């Protein structure tokens, strides 16, 4: 299903979040299936410029945060344990009020070859 940035807010509703466990990214000859781990509000820092993901300890700390974000707006899927071997993707949109971002985090669970 197609997710546009305005759709990300739907995932802050616990029922919607629980009813929509996966999203898909299509690449040439690949269908990538991601399990949604969490959605939460975050500040406006550029994540890739703010963390040294080459450092395994820093990356694991970030993954731990994804699973337990310090945010008033958050929904987290139970039984999601992320490790530095996981491949994650972040979908992001502006917050409706103030500075910051709404982030949806997914973990790759399947990479299917397509024709």
Task: Locate the predicted segments by residue.
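Extracytoplasmic/periplasmic soluble domains downstream of a signal peptide or transmembrane helix
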Residues: 1-115
